[in-house]
Amino acid sequence: MRSTFSYLIIPVVLMMGSVANAQVHFGSTTAYNATFVLDKGLSEDPRYNSTYTYQTSPIGFNFGVDIGKKFGLQLESILSNQGQIYDVINTAKEIAGSRKIDLQYIHIPLMMKFMGSGDATVRGNFNFGPQLSILNRGVESLVTNAGNFQIPEGVDFATIKQDFPSATDNGNGTYNIPQNIPSRDILKKELDDFKNTEFQLAAAFGLDIDLSRHLFLTTQIRANYSLTDMRNKDIINALQAGDYSDIFGGRANFIVGVQLGLHYYFGTLRSFGSRK
């Protein structure tokens, strides 16, 4: 908690120096996102097929400073649920289970905001900046039904036997699981299988809509992408060494969605200030 507070307060303090000659606003947001876990290994594995996964960022807060009509800075804190579900596919190309990556982050982006300079009630904007993402919850789980499954290229049956003790080798590049295997956790935050923090890039474009002299609404299409693998080094090394029955590939978070926000502006919003 102390480190999270530090990440929030230090940029705010740095921004305060410009407040005297700028306009300040703060607000809250909510968002609905399509979330992806981009994993090269899972995408190349014939046993898995990615599905469209949707999650919410139920609440977010921001503090912004507009330095003139065209540019501003905005510090945000966003609670974000994300991850992805992969279907487990057997040799008959049927769904035979699921692999679920369930993540929750506190995103702390510092955005540069480029705005339209006019005095219209509705104005366009583009935002871009670095983002620190703090993992709050992380679980990767697997449910597998009985059936025959293809052995991926580069993976041997001995490794599969370690992960699925009841599996038998069919001798033709496939293996059999004789009975359903209930949900089990593959990776967990509590076991330090995930990195606690990630560095990401965030971007958004949308509209500022003045509602009154001090209130404005924002609507944005927003995305962020992680530049580092979410798993810790020990897990990555074990995958590269072939200690798991998965194909190794880099893994990244990517989300894109629609965000709505309501903000209070200290001073008079420009569309009202220009009215006679």
Predicted regions: what they are:
Residues 53-57, 102-108, 122, 195-201, ...:
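Residues that define the transmembrane beta-barrel architecture of outer-membrane proteins
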Residues 38-45, 80, 85-94, 138-145, ...:
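Outer-membrane beta-barrel translocator domains and adjoining extracellular loop/strand segments
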Residues 193-194, 198, 206, 210-276:
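Predominantly the C-terminal beta-signal and adjacent terminal strand-loop region
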Residues 22-60, 194, 263-276:
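Short glycine/proline- and aromatic-enriched beta-strand/turn motifs that initiate or cap beta-hairpins
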Residues 28-32, 59-67, 108-114, 128-132, ...:
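Residues on the lipid-exposed face of transmembrane beta-strands in outer-membrane beta-barrel proteins
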Residues 44-51, 93-100, 188-193, 244-250:
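Extracellular loop and loop/strand-boundary signature of outer-membrane beta-barrel proteins
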Residues 22-26, 69-73, 106, 120-126, ...:
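Outer-envelope beta-barrel architecture signal
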Residues 49-94, 106:
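Glycine- and aromatic-enriched membrane insertion/assembly motifs of diderm outer-membrane
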